[in-house]
């Protein structure tokens, strides 16, 4: 900028219009604080790395220390640059103060103008010619050049103090290949049994693997209910018996019960004997004993005699037309119908014998 083309009062006014040296001094203090903090971090990191090297030895330790050592160098470099900028800010404040002291002040310039005006007004018969020339010389030569020179020096020092060295960012401590592979967690690891990392596959293969990985999620969601049903059937099969081909191995509850079963819970009518011949405890499930059918007894225990005798044996002493056992409302002790002889009833000893057989049968089942 052509400072010599401007009057001294304009140059001085431009210089005085700034914020002064206070911002530069504050910036210098901030850079000094940052430099001290970086130095402390560098010292602490160096101590930590030394302790790590003593506690951890081997190839991995050497690689870790070699990767972390540049961090210490970067901290030290940044601290040095912070100190340099603090010095530059301090020098800028000093340059401003020097420029303000060198340039003519506005009151001095104003006094020159006032003196010039008075001498010109009182210049009768040329008596003030020499004082007027000296006043003009002081303004145009000394003040003008002094103000311009002060601004030129201040501009040059400002250019030097604002020229900062570029601070390079800290380099990554990871290898370039490792940092690139970690960006994709799916393809960053090689598959088991493969000698080539997945990250080095062609782009087409990588894209295909990505599509397969995206499709595996919905397929797992679709097959999850089927897996639950399969596990349920496996549990039922394990409980029902070890050999699925053997239909008579065991039965779980009433599953697999024969349609010809006489068990009441399976849809049967219960024992063929009437209610008058057996006690309530002798019916399956009516007493405190464990409910069991003859089929279950044959499958689990040794074969036993059936608890109910054939109906033909009970009716051997009765003539044709006699009512079967248990047909009447009162059991075997009831009177016969119109087609039988008057007063003909079922033999009482037979009913007592059937009751004792049933009780013995259920007692054996209770022991089980």
Curated annotation (Swiss-Prot):
One protein family per Pfam: PPE
Leader peptide range in chain numbering: none
Gene3D superfamilies in alphabetical order: PPE superfamily (1.20.1260.20)
Disruption phenotype: Inactivation does not abolish EsxA secretion, EsxA-specific immunogenicity and enhanced virulence.
Biased composition (Acidic residues): 354-368
Entry similarity comment: Belongs to the mycobacterial PPE family.
Protein name: PPE family immunomodulator PPE68
């Amino acid at each position: 900028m052509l400072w010599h083309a401007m009057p001294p009062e304009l140059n001085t006014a431009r210089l005085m219009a700034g914020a002064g040296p206070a911002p530069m001094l504050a910036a210098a203090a901030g850079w000094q604080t940052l430099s001290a903090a970086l130095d402390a971090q560098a010292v602490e990191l160096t101590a930590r790395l030394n302790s790590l090297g003593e506690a951890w030895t081997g190839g991995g330790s050497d690689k870790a220390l070699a990767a972390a050592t540049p961090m210490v160098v970067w901290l030290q470099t940044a601290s040095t640059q912070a100190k340099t900028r603090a010095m530059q800010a301090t020098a800028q404040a000093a340059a401003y103060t020097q420029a303000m002291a060198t340039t003519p002040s506005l009151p001095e310039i104003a006094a020159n103008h006032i003196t010039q005006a008075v001498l010109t007004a009182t210049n009768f018969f040329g008596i003030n010619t020499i004082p007027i020339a000296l006043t003009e010389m002081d303004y145009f030569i000394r003040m003008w050049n002094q103000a311009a020179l002060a601004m030129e020096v201040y501009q040059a020092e400002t250019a030097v103090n604002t020229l900062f060295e570029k601070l390079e960012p800290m380099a990554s401590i990871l290898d370039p290949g490792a940092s690139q592979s970690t960006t994709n967690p799916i393809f960053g690891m090689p598959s088991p049994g493969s000698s080539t990392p997945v990250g080095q596959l062609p782009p087409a293969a990588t894209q295909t693997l990505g599509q397969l990985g995206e499709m595996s999620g919905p397929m797992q969601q679709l097959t999850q209910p089927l897996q639950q049903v399969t596990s349920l059937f496996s549990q039922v099969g394990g409980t029902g018996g070890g050999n699925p081909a053997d239909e008579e191995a065991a039965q779980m509850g009433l599953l697999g019960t024969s349609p010809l079963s006489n068990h009441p819970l399976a849809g049967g009518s219960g024992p063929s004997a009437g209610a008058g011949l057996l006690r309530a405890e002798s019916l399956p499930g009516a007493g405190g004993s464990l409910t069991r059918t003859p089929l279950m007894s044959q499958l689990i225990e040794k074969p036993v005699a059936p608890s109910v005798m054939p109906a033909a044996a009970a009716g051997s002493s009765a003539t044709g037309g006699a009512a079967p056992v248990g047909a009447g409302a009162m059991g075997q002790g009831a009177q016969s119908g119109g087609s039988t002889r008057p007063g003909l009833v079922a033999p009482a000893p037979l009913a007592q014998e059937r009751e004792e057989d049933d009780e013995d049968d259920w007692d054996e089942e209770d022991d089980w």
